[in-house]
Design a protein with these regions (language model features):
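Electropositive, glycine- and tryptophan-enriched low-complexity nucleic-acid-binding patches
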Residues: 216-264
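Active-site- or DNA-interface-adjacent structural scaffold in DNA-acting proteins
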Residues: 36-208
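Basic, short loop/linker segments at the boundary and entry of helix-turn-helix/winged-helix-like folds
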Residues: 1-4, 11
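Helix-centered, glycine/charged polyanion-binding patches within enzymatic domains
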Residues: 266-336
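Flexible, glycine/threonine-enriched loop-and-boundary segments that flank and lead into catalytic domains
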Residues: 203-220
Length: 375
């Protein structure tokens, strides 16, 4: 049942709570999840889906993607020849965080330290609860009014408040617990990082978030992790997806993407079509022919030109993954959550294609061609 609920969740782009409610009112969803009779009670608590995802991990979620490919092969929707040519590209899976600013990081970090100190019964000299809130509000007002000197002064004041609280806790606690120790380490990184620092902290609750720039005019920076995607060139079936941390160069991810496809599908492609981000033959697999999009079309045959034109077909797949299958904003925690959400989104996309294939077959076999709707 939980397997079916997760397929439906990412196929229809709904939350854990909504998929459980939809199960209760939709007999087709109940039949898909294995029920023989209609039920009038919720199948489980939405938190059960969270616990189940943690238990199976990303290795278990990879089986979801593998099963959609196997089902497509059994039903004749995916031919073996399709695995010969694939398209590979990368995108950014954004994390569910607020846009990071220095003032917000100082303010939120101080609040987190004060809250944890209260749980541990640590008597702080001063918490700066009222002063910190007032300084944060003033900073936002001054910045909005383009009064940068006043805004920077309030930002510096927020940084001072955070440093005072951090040092006060360190003086009074010699052996902090794991949670408090982690917060103190994050606060130290926030206080010491500068504009040109590497591996900066952009979120308190998601310190693994990276800042990635893909050259988009409408969105200069994206905060999350890079995702590598492999699709078949002909029919756009997703045969591989990986969440990559550390913002690696696209060319360095190609071998791992092909290896994951081999793990999921059971065979390696013969030809791979990529964009200019994959330049550098040193990073390409030796047994796979890699076609870069910078090759002159005049020197291509008609057949080669046709397949090269199909490379851009992966772009709408990325858009569908984000806007239709829960990958535009990841709410799952940690790096493992990034991997799980990317795999579930890919499995949901393939499952939607299988549903469309089933209904098109149903309309073809059971509805007469002469049938017309009355207007």
């Amino acid at each position: 049942m939980l397997v079916g609920l997760h397929y439906l969740k990412h196929a229809y782009n709904v939350s854990d709570e909504r998929v459980v409610e939809g199960y209760l009112e939709n007999p087709y969803w109940q039949y898909f999840c294995g029920n023989e009779y209609f039920e009038h009670d919720l199948p489980c608590d939405p938190t059960s889906l969270v616990k189940w995802r943690k238990r199976i991990g990303s290795e278990g979620v990879e089986k979801f993607l593998e099963e959609t490919i196997l089902l497509g092969q059994r039903e004749g929707e995916i031919k073996d020849q399709e695995f010969r040519r694939v398209n590979v590209d990368t995108t950014v899976q954004e994390k569910a965080i607020a846009f990071p600013t220095d003032a917000r990081l100082y303010h939120k970090m101080r609040q987190a330290l004060v809250k944890e100190a209260s749980k541990e019964n640590i008597q702080l000299r001063q918490s700066y609860k009222r002063k910190g809130k007032l300084a944060f509000i003033k900073q936002g007002r001054y910045f909005h009014a383009k009064q940068s000197k006043r805004a920077n002064k309030e930002t510096k004041r927020l940084k001072t408040y955070l440093g005072c609280v951090k040092r006060d806790i360190e003086r009074k606690v010699e052996n902090p617990n794991i949670r408090l120790k982690s917060l103190l380490e994050i606060s130290e990184r926030i206080l010491t990082q500068t504009k040109n620092s590497k591996n900066k902290i952009y979120s308190i609750h998601a310190p693994e978030v990276e800042c990635i720039s893909k050259g988009k005019s409408h969105k200069r920076y994206e905060f999350g992790c890079k995702v590598s995607l492999v699709t078949t060139s002909k029919s756009n079936w997703i045969v591989g997806v990986q969440a990559l941390h550390g913002n690696p160069y696209d060319g360095h991810t190609l071998k791992d993407a092909i290896n994951q496809m081999e793990k999921v599908v059971g065979r390696r492609p013969k030809e791979v079509y990529v964009d200019l981000g994959y330049k550098g033959k040193d990073h390409h697999p030796e047994d796979v022919q890699v076609h870069l999009s910078n090759k002159s079309r005049k020197n291509m045959t008609r057949w080669e030109r046709m397949w090269m034109n199909r490379r851009s077909a992966i772009e709408p797949v990325i858009s569908h993954l984000k806007h239709d299958h829960n990958m535009i904003r990841n709410f799952l925690k940690g790096r493992e959550g990034d991997r799980i959400n990317a795999l579930f989104a890919a499995a949901g996309c393939n499952f939607s294609k299988l549903l469309r294939a089933f209904f098109s077959l149903f309309l073809k076999d059971y509805i007469s061609p002469s049938f017309s709707f009355a207007i």
